[in-house]
Amino acid sequence: MTPRLSFHKYQGLGNDFILVDNRWQSQPCLSPEEAVALCNRRFGVGADGVIFLLPGQEGADFSMRLFNSDGSEAEMCGNGIRCLARFLQDLGIPGRDGAYQIHTLAGRIVPQVRADGLVTVDMGIPRLLAKQIPTTLVEPDEKVIRQPLAVAGREWRVTAVSMGNPHCVVFLEEEGSLEELDLAAVGPLFEHHPAFPERTNTEFVQVLSPTRLRLRVWERGAGATLACGTGACAVLVAAVLEERAESQATVELPGGNLEIRWDPSTQHVWMTGPALHVFSGTTAG
């Protein structure tokens, strides 16, 4: 049973999180097992993960930690950090021009709450070498672009990108195949494939045009979700690497759309999307 706890529920395109104000200590106030109980949609609050707002470190304003619904810890989460920025604003902490320097396990990330309520995030520079993903699909210092991967009795072509967390991107060539994909069956096979020693998030993508992509995602530690911010960023990067898309595109997810831009001059990836407060409460303890 989780201890008595004040919490705040937020969602970004249906990717939902329990936010905990944990600024009074440097470690999360819940164990991974307690986070699992809290995320349970029948016996707990229900969420894809628990996000802890922690004191800043290494010069950042604040720190963020995230336990997935299975108790594993994620290095970063694009939808989650947008929700954290909205949470900070709702706490009455304005930031500098609406921007916050957030320390994560993937490095420093800078979300900014815009005047129109959307949140734009500098997601940093994507990591493309196999050793940075990590994956054993190619040699450590090589990029993973359209490499063959055997899963569920067939060969898939995959491109791997790290946005601070690992992503395996699969472009589906046949019209209608995205909707017909049995994500619950194939997703775990990608996630736990031995070619990804730290497991992986997996995105299945249909290219609608050079500026519009549609995807479904299987998240490492959370399963099928309505949206994945780092996944949307990884998909655009992979689409550019495979010469399927321009450097700025709308990414359609089951929960809604994100605007993603890969700046050719700085190599930084920028994500813009919503983050909304759903409700606040206190657990019984």
From Swiss-Prot:
Pathway: Amino-acid biosynthesis; L-lysine biosynthesis via DAP pathway; DL-2,6-diaminopimelate from LL-2,6-diaminopimelate: step 1/1. It comes from the Bacteria. The record marks 167, 219 as: Could be important to modulate the pK values of the two catalytic cysteine residues. Substrate binds at residues 15, 68, 78-79, 165, 201, 219-220, 229-230. One of its GO terms (molecular function) is diaminopimelate epimerase activity. It is found in: Cytoplasm. Keywords: Amino-acid biosynthesis, Cytoplasm, Isomerase, Lysine biosynthesis. Gene3D superfamilies: Diaminopimelate Epimerase, Chain A, domain 1 (3.10.310.10). Belongs to the diaminopimelate epimerase family. This is Diaminopimelate epimerase. The gene is dapF.
